[in-house]
C-alpha cells in the first residue's frame, strides 16, 4: 500500500490527504483515512492531521485545488511535518508539483 521505496521513519509526523469524489461519501473517505493512519502508525509514524476536499475529479497538476494545497503547505510549515501521504495513486508529476508547492516530502498510497 505505502510505496516501499519511501520508508517511514519512526516518530515521523505525517499528514494525510484525500479527495472526496462524486462516487464516494465523506464517511467512506474517512474510513480510508483511518486505515491509512493505522498503516502509517504501524510503520512508526505519528498521523497528526487529515485534510479532505470534495472535488468532481482531482486536479491534474496537484490532485487537490490550489487553496487546499496552500492550506496543507501552511500547516506543514507551521507544525514541522515530515511527510504528507495522499490516499490515492498520484502521477510522478503530481508528486513533484505537490512536493515543490508544500516544501515537504510527499508520497501516495
Role assignments for model-derived ranges:
Residues 1-109:
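N-terminal accessory targeting/assembly segments
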